Design a protein with these regions (language model features):
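Residue-level "edge-of-site" marker
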Residues: 22, 42, 57, 111, ...
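Rossmann-fold dinucleotide-binding core
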Residues: 85-165
């Protein structure tokens, strides 16, 4: 879902530096105006805000804390917005590791699937510092029909899980 979300950000005028192991996805997004990077580290070296959207908890951990990951290139004050739907304890642990390096994290799992990612009508539940939510609200709304602040870092992931269980 990261590809259509990226395209919506580009259409809204945001400049993007992108990395993905899926080279076809990177090619498609760079053809729309993004710049490609060789790693998450390289993205973080060039950006003050990094958005991750990957399939699961191990992928987020690798992309953020792994070798050549976001944390390797991020400077203090960088903000990570993880839009993946991952295990809440993993989100909390990643946020704690980033905080040690002066990196803030917003947990912003999405609901709605690829069709809603394409048309920019995802639902996003955001956890983290309220001032960061306020600062990045407009950017998140480019990808969503609904962006809701749910409190500190972990409650967003819990809320996402509860919503999924409710829908079952």
């Amino acid at each position: 879902m990261g590809k259509p979300m990226s395209k919506n950000l580009l259409k809204a005028g945001y400049e993007l530096v992108v990395f993905d192991f899926n080279k076809d996805a990177v090619k498609e997004v760079t053809e729309c105006g993004a710049v490609s990077a060789a790693s998450g580290r390289e993205v973080a070296e060039q950006c003050g805000v990094v958005i991750t959207m990957v399939p699961n908890s191990p992928h987020v951990r690798a992309a953020v804390l792994g070798e050549n990951g976001v944390a390797d290139g991020a400077k203090p004050g960088t903000v990570l917005i993880d839009m993946s739907s991952i295990d809440p304890t993993e989100s909390k642990d990643i946020g704690a590791e980033l905080a040690k390096k002066g990196i803030d994290m917003l947990d912003a799992p999405v609901s709605g699937g690829e069709p809603k990612a394409i048309d920019g009508t995802l639902s996003v539940m955001v956890g983290g510092k309220k001032e960061l939510f306020d600062k990045y609200y407009d950017m998140l709304m480019v990808m969503a029909g609904s962006v809701v602040y749910v409190g500190e870092l972990v409650p967003a992931t819990w809320q996402s899980w509860q919503t999924r269980l409710w829908l079952l």
